[in-house]
Amino acid sequence: MKRTYQPKNRKHKRVHGFLSRMSTPNGRNVLKRRRAKGRKKLSA
């Protein structure tokens, strides 16, 4: 049986990257929360 996670860099960036986070209000909320929490890495 094939494993479910077949990583692709382009897909990963497009779905979870910084620009995609910034492009929606909810994504901005995600970044805001992660900044408040003090995450070293904000997005993928």
UniProtKB/Swiss-Prot annotation:
One of its GO terms (cellular component) is ribosome. GO terms for molecular function: structural constituent of ribosome. Keywords: Ribonucleoprotein, Ribosomal protein. GO terms for biological process: translation. Residues 1-44 are annotated as: Disordered. Residues 1-16, 30-44 have a biased composition (Basic residues). InterPro entries: Ribosomal_bL34 (IPR000271), Ribosomal_bL34_CS (IPR020939). It holds the Pfam family Ribosomal_L34. Belongs to the bacterial ribosomal protein bL34 family. This is Large ribosomal subunit protein bL34. The lineage of its organism: Bacteria, Bacillati, Bacillota, Clostridia, Eubacteriales. The gene is rpmH.
